[in-house]
C-alpha cells in the first residue's frame, strides 16, 4: 500500500508477496487462514491461494486486481517509461497544495469530487518519498502495462473449488471496473 512501512529493494512480484506472507504465517504459527486482499492485495491473495493452497481456508477479494485487463488510465500511465521521473513532480508539495485548493473549490460549487479522486490524491502524496515511489513503480510494472493488467487469475479459478470465496466491490470503482467482479463471480463456483 501507501503506508509508512519499509520499502526495501526486494522482489515486488505477486509471487514474492505471497512468499513473504507464507513466511509471516509460518513465523506466527498459523497453518490455515482466511486470506483477504484489496486491490493489489487481491492479486496477492489469489497468488497465495495458488502457491500455498493448503494454507488457504477461505478467500475474500475486495475490488481485486488480477481479474481482468481493464484498469484506470492513471495506473497504466504509471507504467510508461519515465514515470519514475514524472511521479515526483505529481507528488510535489506544490501540486498537492493545488489539488487540495481545487478540491475545496469544487466543494463550494455543485461539483463534488468522488471519494476515489480524494483517495488517489492521498496515494500520490505518498509518492513524494523516493523509496515509496520506487516500490510503487516496481510493483505496478510487475502487474500492469500501458495496455492494462498483465496478469490474470482467470485460468486458475478452479483452485478455489471447495474454498468459500467472497467477492466485494464498489459499484463506482474508478480504478478497477466492477465488471471484473461479475466475471469472477460467474467463474468461481460458490462465490
Question: What is the meaning of each model-derived region?
Answer:
Residues 1-3, 66, 173:
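Alpha/beta-hydrolase active-site loop signature
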Residues 1-40, 72-75:
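Active-site loop/oxyanion-hole signature of alpha/beta-hydrolase fold enzymes
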Residues 21, 25, 35, 63, ...:
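Generic structural signal for small/hydrophobic residues in well-ordered secondary structure
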Residues 26-32, 53-54, 162-163, 189-190:
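Active-site acidic short loop of glycosyltransferases
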Residues 44-48:
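Hydrolases whose catalytic domains are alpha/beta-hydrolase-1, hotdog thioesterase
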Residues 50-51, 56-93, 97-98:
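Flexible "cap/lid" loop of the alpha/beta hydrolase fold
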Residues 98-115, 120-127, 139-145:
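Helix-loop "lid/cap" segments that line or gate small-molecule binding pockets
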Residues 127-186:
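Conserved serine/cysteine hydrolase catalytic core
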